[in-house]
């Protein structure tokens, strides 16, 4: 299996030159553009990895599936989806267009920034510190890694330059789509995006989802089955931003990307996959990481369609 991964990485390294690291968050622009790694966890508890699978990077938008799971567990799916939609979008992940165009002003799905900010507001906790503490502990739980922590430099960079996210949040506050203290909610959001993980962590999160919310290592149920199902479905329809349809056709498995270069994916009842490729395409997805998943999906016949 490791030989296969090594071959797939080398086959797709050429795509790195066509992408760029995220530059709108200054701290992310310091990332090495050439990082490329993959990790896979099977339902039998076997782990394989190749390349830069142990390099730490920030989770960014992959945290949106973490907070979505937690918000549904805390509030129930009916309440969560009364505040945020579940439809795909053709606009960019940080766009304000749909918030203005829709009569309800409700964010169109939980995987775009506006939707994720609303979801963060629904995580239970008496204040922003308690909310984030629960998110961090939940991330550690679903990945089986108690050493996961926040990258404070990225957090500060996000907080200082997150003007678009502030605009989205204050617009939603003005329409009633977002309840609570905007700056406290944004603080939770900036912190959740700054959690530092590796490909190995993502693969373990992926395999938990592939196993319908049960850890293949301990046999313990970590996430209710219906929550895992909802999140996997949203990952298919919305997880790769406005490239989700293309990803579904060519790769065909639930996945969620982040501008840190990571992608978490799962092949239901087979495996979890974590990929890192810091060079991004124009949609904000890892360009080589996507190509690696495409080749892996074809080689192992992973598509659910």
UniProtKB/Swiss-Prot annotation:
Keywords: Hydrolase. It holds the Pfam family Glutaminase. Substrate binds at residues 61, 113, 158, 165, 189, 241, 259. Gene3D superfamilies: DD-peptidase/beta-lactamase superfamily (3.40.710.10). Its EC number is 3.5.1.2. It catalyses: L-glutamine + H2O = L-glutamate + NH4(+). It comes from the Bacteria. GO terms for biological process: glutamate biosynthetic process; glutamine catabolic process. Disulfide bonds: none annotated. One of its GO terms (molecular function) is glutaminase activity. It is an enzyme of class 3 (hydrolase). Homotetramer. Belongs to the glutaminase family. This is Glutaminase. The lineage of its organism: Bacteria, Bacillati, Bacillota, Clostridia, Eubacteriales.
């Amino acid at each position: 299996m490791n030989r296969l991964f090594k071959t797939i990485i080398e086959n797709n390294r050429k795509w790195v030159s066509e992408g760029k690291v995220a530059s709108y968050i200054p701290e992310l622009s310091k990332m090495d553009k050439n990082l490329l790694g993959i990790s896979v966890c099977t339902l039998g508890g076997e782990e394989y990895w190749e390349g830069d699978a142990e390099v730490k990077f920030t989770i960014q938008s992959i945290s949106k599936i973490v907070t979505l799971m937690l918000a549904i567990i805390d509030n129930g799916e009916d309440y969560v989806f009364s505040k945020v939609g579940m439809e795909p979008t053709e606009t960019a992940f940080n766009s304000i267009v749909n918030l203005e165009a829709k009569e309800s002003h409700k964010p169109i799905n939980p995987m775009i920034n506006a939707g994720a900010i609303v979801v963060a507001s629904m995580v239970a906790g008496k204040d922003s510190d308690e909310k984030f503490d629960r998110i961090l502990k939940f991330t550690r739980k679903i990945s089986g890694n108690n050493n996961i922590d926040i990258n404070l430099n990225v957090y500060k960079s996000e907080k200082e330059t997150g003007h678009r996210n502030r605009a989205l949040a204050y617009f939603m506050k003005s329409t009633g789509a977002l309840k609570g203290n905007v700056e406290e909610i944004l603080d939770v959001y900036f912190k959740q995006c700054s959690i530092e993980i590796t490909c190995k962590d993502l693969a373990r999160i992926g395999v938990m989802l592939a196993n319908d919310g049960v850890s293949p290592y301990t046999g313990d149920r970590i996430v209710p089955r219906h929550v895992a199902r909802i999140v996997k479905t949203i990952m298919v329809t919305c997880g790769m931003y406005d490239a989700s349809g293309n990803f579904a056709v060519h790769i065909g498995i639930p996945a969620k990307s982040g501008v840190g270069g990571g992608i978490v994916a799962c092949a239901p009842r087979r495996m979890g996959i974590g990929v890192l490729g810091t060079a991004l395409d124009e949609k904000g997805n890892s360009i080589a990481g996507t190509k690696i998943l495409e080749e892996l999906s074809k080689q192992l016949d992973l598509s659910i369609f």
